[in-house]
């Protein structure tokens, strides 16, 4: 116990416990991996890991030249860590800094994950160190967080070693297992601030229809999700769908900027 042992940092203040709570896990201990550096000249310890461990590999017997394809798991690619369902236990234990692995992830990933964990921490604080709602209500809330976290990039989830598990869990699929995928549709060509309307050019996907879930991302805009409704074409006419190669306008609740990218969000089957 930090308080009982009076463990203090350089400034004489009690140190704060931090923990990695969510996101991609490296197969190596303490980041001591040189696969990327040795094979591609990109050092993981300088933030440039090419993650070649995430690929599929053949295992070859040196003596007999027998080859085996490991096709049911990616044996060097762990599932992503997720702790939100037992976050109250970690906070009760004294953790005060939560680390989220978000390197090279999209703005929608950062927004979603940070929002979920912030909501969980605020709920715990509201109850003065306990969940302030009943068991059924907190189970429903955790299920909601799990659903939202599953919609952004992930390789499947596990608890890590926090709850006593000794063997790691490996992903069964290359790339993301998110329940939704984003498909690039086009870019913002203009924004009319006085009426909060954004104009876009549909350059990639076949069509956008009324009711479609959309995502807008940009350096300053961050990540903004909306549902396509009241779609107007370049002539100002109301449409239920827009075809590739057309300009269209949507009313937005947030400021959108020229050059921002718009994506169509599709349920992954």
Model-derived regions: residue spans:
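Surface-exposed amphipathic alpha-helical tracts and adjacent flexible/coil segments at the periphery
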Residues: 1-269
């Amino acid at each position: 116990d930090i308080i009982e042992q009076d463990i203090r940092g350089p400034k004489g203040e009690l140190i704060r416990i931090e923990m990695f709570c969510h996101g991609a896990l490296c197969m190596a201990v303490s980041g001591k991996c040189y696969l990327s550096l040795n094979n591609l000249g990109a050092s993981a310890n300088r933030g440039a890991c090419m993650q070649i461990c995430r690929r599929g590999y053949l295992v070859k017997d040196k003596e007999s030249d027998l080859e085996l394809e490991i096709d049911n798991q990616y044996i060097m690619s762990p599932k992503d860590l997720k702790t939100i369902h037992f976050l109250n236990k970690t906070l009760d234990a004294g953790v005060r800094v939560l680390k989220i692995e978000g390197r090279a992830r999209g703005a929608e990933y950062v927004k979603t994950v940070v929002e979920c964990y912030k909501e969980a921490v605020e709920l715990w604080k509201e109850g003065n160190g306990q969940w302030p709602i009943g068991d059924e209500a907190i189970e429903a809330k955790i299920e909601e967080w799990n659903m939202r976290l599953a919609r952004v990039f992930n390789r499947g989830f596990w608890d890590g070693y926090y709850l006593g598990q000794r063997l790691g869990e490996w992903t069964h699929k290359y790339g993301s297992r998110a329940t939704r995928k984003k498909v690039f549709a086009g870019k913002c060509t203009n924004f009319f601030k006085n009426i909060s309307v954004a104009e876009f050019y549909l350059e990639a996907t076949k069509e956008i229809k009324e009711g479609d879930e959309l995502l807008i991302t940009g350096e300053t805009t961050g990540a903004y999700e909306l549902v396509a409704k009241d779609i107007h074409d370049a002539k100002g006419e109301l449409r239920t769908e827009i075809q590739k190669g057309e300009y269209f306008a949507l009313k937005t609740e947030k400021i959108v900027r020229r050059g921002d990218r718009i994506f169509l969000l599709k349920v992954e089957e």
